């Protein structure tokens, strides 16, 4: 595979925030860039390129033939921003050698509307890490 989600020897992944002006079609989002990235109006809680995610690794289920990757929740503290989308992307590892662009996209999260935080904490809480709910699931 092009992305290595192993918690011990896998690639490094980040989560960046974007405004509702970002075009998020599969052909438009191939990797991280600063176009329409959420700006930090005040405070120091969000910087360009976002947060590094803690990768909890890959788990599988032999009964359902579904594997899933999981990340720990991540927070931006003392942040003032408005975001609609989050991009999970591979920030280091095998992307270039696997033929992918540097900072290649894994997935886009849509918050369903603008989410505004003013001098507060914005937490991205990942769903239950299981075969029905995990953000990244692969069946075989």
Predicted regions and their residues:
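Small cysteine-rich, disulfide-bonded extracellular modules of the LU/uPAR three-finger superfamily
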Residues: 1-84, 91-140
């Amino acid at each position: 595979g092009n992305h290595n989600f192993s918690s011990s020897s896998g690639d490094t992944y980040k989560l960046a925030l974007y405004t509702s002006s970002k075009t998020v079609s599969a052909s438009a989002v191939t990797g991280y860039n600063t176009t329409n990235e959420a700006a930090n109006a005040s405070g120091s809680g969000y910087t360009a390129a976002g947060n590094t995610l803690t990768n909890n690794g890959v788990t599988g289920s032999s009964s359902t033939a579904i594997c899933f990757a999981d990340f720990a929740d991540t927070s931006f503290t003392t942040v003032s921003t408005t975001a609609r989308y989050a991009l999970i992307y591979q920030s280091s590892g095998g992307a270039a050698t696997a033929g992918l662009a540097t900072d290649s996209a894994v997935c886009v999260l849509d918050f369903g509307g603008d989410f505004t935080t003013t001098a507060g904490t914005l937490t991205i809480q990942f769903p239950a890490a299981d075969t029905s709910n995990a953000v990244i699931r692969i069946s075989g």
